[in-house]
Amino acid sequence: MQQPNPKQTIMTLQQKNKKWRIVDVIFLLLLPFFSNAATPEESKEEILFVTSYNSDTKYTYDNINTFVETYRLLGGKYSTIVENMNATDLNQAREWKKTLTNILDKHPNAKLVILLGGEAWSSFLHLEDEKYKQLPVFCAMATRNGIRIPEDSIHIQTYDPPSIDLTERMKEYNVIYCNTYEYDIDRDIEMMRSFYPDMEHLVFISDNTYNGLAEQAWVKKNMVRYPELSTTYIDGRTHTLDAAVNQLRKVPKNSVMLLGIWRIDSRGITYMNNSVYAFSKANPSLPVFSMTATAIGYWAIGGYVPQYAGIGQNIDRKSVV
């Protein structure tokens, strides 16, 4: 089916008055940082990428590579360094802030820090030390609707965080540029009902990752506007893949499923396409939609999906004059 126009938000923070505005092209944004760039022989200053996941994954690698190539073509002189937080499942979430500060402290000459992924965003935006708040930062490759990373005293399997707008937290930090997106749950519900007007129940699947829990929190926040729809949350923090499949077989009639993400289950086991295959066989008559593009084209009927691609070129044109 033909998809609606994707929605993508690009934002910049003016340092003096802290007001947000939508931007398309900002070639002069970082003039104070790059107009007097030194040669590598004169300075060890660098641009530091901090990725939430392995930088060798195609999506992350392509965006970093596009940035570096275009940055050089536009005359950038600073070296680019990539560090990886190696974030996986939520069982290690309490370590993420310490992992991030170790990376930042390792690179005191970073002229600019580029945070890629929700784990990196949320970890950074909950650092209280003023030295981190003053770092010039770009944020990309994550939804604006995130969660607070749990503290040591919080049991991750029962943690029920509210969805928070991370772009609001950015006002306390030196975030110069933010490329983000937002899942439009209202449009997804509208699409489901247009196909299945008898829909009475929503099934939402999410996994044992930061993105999974952030998506679940965002869906919960939106579903309060639909009291007529009951909801089942199949949660990878408490479910193995087999347990999730069994729960899917027992959903009420007139249910419609909305896919978030299922990459890692409660045991920390990582799944690729085999999880989609298992879910699709569990309840073949259940209509399925996707808010993340997962399974669209071979299992999910459709969904209102943000635009994820093209981040590299957007960032690099704001990094060099």
Spans of model-derived segments:
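Bacterial N-terminal signal peptides
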Residues: 24-32
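Short beta-strand segments enriched in small/hydrophobic residues
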Residues: 43-59, 202-205
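An alpha-beta-alpha
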Residues: 47, 166-222
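Periplasmic-binding protein-like
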Residues: 49-50, 106-117, 136-140, 201-206, ...
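Short, well-structured alpha-helical segments in soluble
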Residues: 90-111, 126-129, 245-254
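Venus flytrap/periplasmic-binding-protein-like
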Residues: 136-148, 273-299
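Short beta-strand elements at the ligand-binding edges of bilobed clamshell
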Residues: 149-186, 297-313
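Conserved small/polar residues in nucleotide/adenosyl-binding loops
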Residues: 318-320
